[in-house]
């Protein structure tokens, strides 16, 4: 999994919802700093958060783990 690509995709999906990092963090019960780390490619979401994150963003697990952002 490409951390930078996944992080960018999380940020894109979050912004499409009109949410701040803090709002997404609150939905998931985590800190906004964790969301920031994902979006900057410094870390990946914990395995236990993948399903809640994909559901919150309205995407599939497959889309989350292998984002196609049109750069192929």
Predicted regions and their residues:
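Short alpha-helical DNA-recognition segment
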Residues: 18-37, 52
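Short coil turns linking two alpha-helices in DNA-binding domains
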Residues: 2, 20, 31-34, 46, ...
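DNA major-groove recognition helix of helix-turn-helix/homeodomain DNA-binding modules
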Residues: 48-63
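Short, conserved catalytic or interaction motifs in soluble domains
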Residues: 40
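Short, charged recognition helix plus adjacent turn
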Residues: 66-72
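A short, Lys/Arg-rich alpha-helix, primarily the initiator
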Residues: 1-16
